[in-house]
Amino acid sequence: MAPRALPGSAVLAAAVFVGGAVSSPLVAPDNGSSRTLHSRTETTPSPSNDTGNGHPEYIAYALVPVFFIMGLFGVLICHLLKKKGYRCTTEAEQDIEEEKVEKIELNDSVNENSDTVGQIVHYIMKNEANADVLKAMVADNSLYDPESPVTPSTPGSPPVSPGPLSPGGTPGKHVCGHHLHTVGGVVERDVCHRCRHKRWHFIKPTNKSRESRPRRQGEVTVLSVGRFRVTKVEHKSNQKERRSLMSVSGAETVNGEVPATPVKRERSGTE
């Protein structure tokens, strides 16, 4: 018997079924594996990406302006406090400012206490030509006139030396005003070589301890943080006005009159 030929539709259906059965197990595992790999790449973070994203230099760029702004803000605060009468200092700057204040106060006291003759001599001696002529005149008088008075400050005069010492005595202390030293011996010529040739070094005042430094009158510490201090000092003009008022009131009480108050003075003026 000859085999029967299958119809075309049956052959086409069989081919589609076989092709689907063969292709489905091959494609499905590929899709599943790609999905699992894709999910793994999404869920597991890689350490290389984290280290690459961090930029520590950007932190420095952000901190520098912050510190700069803080410094400007501190300077502004100190400027405002100084306008209101406060004083912002540190321990390093305090020594220099105290020396300047002491010099200013010393000059003020000298100017207030000096008399008219002293001021005239001071202004005359400011001129170098006058000072040289005066020194030459004093030197000539001391050389040609043995009876002329010679002071230790006179140019050309021998320095003062202590008197003769007893056998069991101790050497005297020779003080020149510029330096301190000890001179011993019974001969008057036994003097300091530096005094004779005017070679000396000025004595610098010893640095006092911080605790023994007296505070200036009217100084009040408002804030103290480490080396930074904020103090408030009264103006010297107010102190001088108070002193003048006290002196005027004292003079009036000495004369036997009671000082009148400002209210009484106004009433007397209106009357």
From Swiss-Prot:
Residues 155-165 have a biased composition (Pro residues). Residues 233-244 have a biased composition (Basic and acidic residues). Keywords: Cell membrane, Coiled coil, Glycoprotein, Membrane, Phosphoprotein, Signal, Transmembrane, Transmembrane helix. The modification Phosphoserine is found at S109, S114, S244, S247. Widely expressed. Expressed at highest levels in the placenta, skeletal muscle, spleen and testis. Residues 28-53, 145-173, 233-271 are annotated as: Disordered. InterPro entries: RELL1, TNF_rcpt_RELT. The chain crosses the membrane at residues 58-78. The keyword Transmembrane helix applies. Its main location: membrane. It is a single-pass type I membrane protein. Residues 24-57 are extracellular. One of its GO terms (cellular component) is plasma membrane. Induces activation of MAPK14/p38 cascade, when overexpressed. Induces apoptosis, when overexpressed. Belongs to the RELT family. Interacts with RELT, RELL2 and OXSR1. Interacts with PLSCR1. This is RELT-like protein 1. The lineage of its organism: Eukaryota, Metazoa, Chordata, Craniata, Vertebrata. The gene is RELL1.
